[in-house]
Amino acid sequence: MRVRIGLTLLLCAVLLSLASASSDEEGSQDESLDSKTTLTSDESVKDHTTAGRVVAGQIFLDSEESELESSIQEEEDSLKSQEGESVTEDISFLESPNPENKDYEEPKKVRKPALTAIEGTAHGEPCHFPFLFLDKEYDECTSDGREDGRLWCATTYDYKADEKWGFCETEEEAAKRRQMQEAEMMYQTGMKILNGSNKKSQKREAYRYLQKAASMNHTKALERVSYALLFGDYLPQNIQAAREMFEKLTEEGSPKGQTALGFLYASGLGVNSSQAKALVYYTFGALGGNLIAHMVLGYRYWAGIGVLQSCESALTHYRLVANHVASDISLTGGSVVQRIRLPDEVENPGMNSGMLEEDLIQYYQFLAEKGDVQAQVGLGQLHLHGGRGVEQNHQRAFDYFNLAANAGNSHAMAFLGKMYSEGSDIVPQSNETALHYFKKAADMGNPVGQSGLGMAYLYGRGVQVNYDLALKYFQKAAEQGWVDGQLQLGSMYYNGIGVKRDYKQALKYFNLASQGGHILAFYNLAQMHASGTGVMRSCHTAVELFKNVCERGRWSERLMTAYNSYKDGDYNAAVIQYLLLAEQGYEVAQSNAAFILDQREASIVGENETYPRALLHWNRAASQGYTVARIKLGDYHFYGFGTDVDYETAFIHYRLASEQQHSAQAMFNLGYMHEKGLGIKQDIHLAKRFYDMAAEASPDAQVPVFLALCKLGVVYFLQYIRETNIRDMFTQLDMDQLLGPEWDLYLMTIIALLLGTVIAYRQRQHQDMPAPRPPGPRPAPPQQEGPPEQQPPQ
C-alpha cells in the first residue's frame, strides 16, 4: 500500500513538472515574438561581476576593457536559427560553447567602435531613432524585464560581460538635445569672432550669436550676455535684463551668476541694497570656484565689511586666487594696466597719467620706419605688453623687434628670445631659436639675454641642465638690476638648487625683485610670510602681498575698460565697472567710483543715494591709504554731504591726513578750524602754526596761506581791541615819559618837514610839465558836392 502511494506521488510530481516546463516554453516564445531585444530577466545583468554603469547616456565599465573600443568575439559563420528560439538563447549559446563539439573553434577577437546611446529617459516612451543590435537596425526599445520600467536597448554587445546598455531618448529630449547642439554652435561661432577681432562692429556681431545661444538657455552664453548687458559692452546697457539672467543662472547653480547677483545686492543696482544677501551669494559663488567671489570675500574679511574681521579667513581666500594668478604668469609677461585716479587727473590736469597721445605714438612709428632703433625697441615693448594707450599686438611687437635685432640691438634680440621661448599664435615655440637669440644678447652683456640663458640652463630648454651656468647668468643679470634674474636667484636659494639653501638670500632677492614690480616676487614673499619660512610669520603682511598679486590678475584689465568708458562719456558703464572692481578691493576703483558719484555724472544712481554711496567708497579708499579720499571724508562730514554735519569727525579725518600723509590741504583745513573754533576750541596761535605748516608742505599753498595769514592778523587785531579798553589805554599813556617833556615840539617839526616835502614835490612836478602850444588854424570843413546854388531872381 505504501509503495502504491509513493508511486502515485512520484507520477503527480512528474506531470506537474512537465506542465510547468510547457508553460515556460510558451511564455518564452511569446516574449521573443514581442521583442527580440528583451532579456529574459533582470538577473542576467545583475549576476555579472563586471557590470557597467550608465551615466547620462555615456557608458562606464568597471572591467579592464578600453572605454573607446571593446574586443568582442566574432559569431560563428552560421548560428542555429529556429523559429521558437529567443535572442537570449542565441547569446547563451555563444557565451557557453558546447565543449563536446570538436569542430568548434574559438572566435577571433576583432576591434569594433563602441557606439554610445544618446541621452537617457526613465519615462517608458518608445525611442524614435534606429539603433544597432547584433549588427541589425531596430526602431524600438522596451522596458520589459526591468523593475524600474526604464527603457533600454543595446548599442554594442559584449558577449563576455553582456552588460553594455544605452538608454533611448524621447522626442522631447531629442528636440532639446538638438537645440543645445545648435546653441553650442552659436556660442562657439560668437566666441571665435569675439576672440579673433578687435573691431567693434565684429564684436557686436559676435554678441548677436551669443544672444541667440543665450535664448536657447546655453549657460556660458547666458553668462557672457548678462555681463555685457550689465556693463554695456557692445550691447545696450540694461540692468534689469541682466538681473533676470543672473537670477536664472543662479537657479541653475552658476557661480558667475551667483557672484554677479551678490554684486547687484551689494551695490543696490536694480534691487534694494542688502549686504546680507550679497554675502550669501558671494559665498555660494566662492564655493563654486569663482575667483572674483573669492577676491570679494578676501577683501571683506580683511576690512571687516559685513563680517567679523578675520585675517586668517582673508588669507585663505586671497591665497587661493593668488595661486591661479601666479600659475598664469608667462615668460613674456601679461598686459600692462595703468591705475589712473580720476580725482588726481582732475586736480592736476598737467599730471602725466601714463597714457600716450595718438600724435606721439605716430611720431614714434615714423621714427621706427626711418630706422630709429630705440623707437623700434620701445614700440616693440609697448605692443608686447600693451598699455599706455597701445593695444597688445604680438605681431607688431615681433616685427619691431626683428627690425631692431637686425640692426644689432641686444635688447631686441633678448625679447625675441623671450617670444620664441614662450610661443604664441604669432611666434611658434622654439627652444633652439630662443637659445640663439639669448646667447647673442648675453654675449653683448644684455641682462634680459643673460636671464633668458639662465632659464635655459636651469630647465634644460635646448641645452643640458647646468645649475652652475644658470646661477652664473642669473647673478650677472641681477647685478644689472634685472628683476627676472633677481627672482630666479631667490628661487634657487629658496629651493637649494645648485646652491646651499639659504632663506635669507632668497628673501633678499625676492625683495629686490618686488621693488621692480615682479608679480612672482610678491607671491613668493607672501608664501614666506604666510608660512613663516625664513621670516617671522605675519598674516597681515601675507594678506597684503597676496592681495597685491590678486589685483594683477586678468580682471584688472577692466580698469582700463572703465577708464576708456569714462573718457568716452559713458559714465554709467564706467561707474558700474568701477563698482565691481571696488568690491574686489581695488583702491583705485573705489576712489574713481566715489569721484563719479560725487560729481553726479552717473544717472543710474538716484540723487538721494549719490552722496551716501560716494561716502561709502571714499571711506573704503581712505582705509587703504589714499590721501584725497581721507580729505573727502573730512569734507563730507564738514558740509554734511551724505551724512549729518559733524565738525569733530571732520577734524579727526583732517588730522589723520595731516599726520599720516602730510597733506597741505589737510593742514590748511586744520588751521581754518582752529581759527573758527569748529570741532575744537578756538586757538589763533595753533591756526597760524597749521597755516605755516601748509605753506612749508606745498609751494602751491603759499598764496592761500598768505591771504589766510593776513585775515588772521586782522582777526587777531580785532580780538585784541575787543579784549582791551581803548579809552583806558590812552588815559594811562604818559607821552612825557614816553617821548620826553618837549614831545610836542618834535611832533610839530616832523609835521612841518612833511608839509614842506609835499609842497616842494608838487612845485617840481608843475615845473617839469611842458608849456601848452597855441592853437593852430582850424581846418576848413570839407566841401560837399551837390547842385549849384540858384541865384535869386532880380
From Swiss-Prot:
Residues 22-737 are annotated as: Interaction with ERLEC1, OS9 and SYVN1. It is a single-pass type I membrane protein. Keywords: Disease variant, Disulfide bond, Endoplasmic reticulum, Glycoprotein, Host-virus interaction, Intellectual disability, Membrane, Notch signaling pathway, Phosphoprotein, Repeat, Signal, Transmembrane, Transmembrane helix. Changing residue 528 to R: In NEDGSAF; likely pathogenic; results in impaired function in ERAD pathway and decreased degradation of endogenous and model ERAD substrates; decreased SEL1L and SYVN1 protein abundance. One of its GO terms (cellular component) is Derlin-1 retrotranslocation complex. Residues 122-170 form the Fibronectin type-II domain. One of its GO terms (biological process) is protein secretion. Residues 760-794 are cytoplasmic. Disulfide bonds join 127-153, 141-168. Residues 352-537 are annotated as: Important for homodimerization and oligomerization. Sel1-like repeats lie at residues 183-218, 219-254, 255-290, 291-326, 373-409, 410-446, 447-482, 483-518, 519-554, 627-662, 664-699. Residues 771-794 have a biased composition (Pro residues). It is linked to Neurodevelopmental disorder with poor growth, absent speech, progressive ataxia, and dysmorphic facies: A severe, autosomal recessive disorder with onset in infancy and characterized by developmental delay, absent speech, intellectual disability, short stature, microcephaly, facial dysmorphism, hypotonia, and/or ataxia. PANTHER family: PROTEIN SEL-1 HOMOLOG 1 (PTHR11102:SF70), SEL-1-LIKE PROTEIN (PTHR11102). Plays a role in the endoplasmic reticulum quality control (ERQC) system also called ER-associated degradation (ERAD) involved in ubiquitin-dependent degradation of misfolded endoplasmic reticulum proteins. Enhances SYVN1 stability. Plays a role in LPL maturation and secretion. Required for normal differentiation of the pancreas epithelium, and for normal exocrine function and survival of pancreatic cells. May play a role in Notch signaling. This is Protein sel-1 homolog 1. It comes from Homo sapiens. The lineage of its organism: Eukaryota, Metazoa, Chordata, Craniata, Vertebrata. The gene is SEL1L.
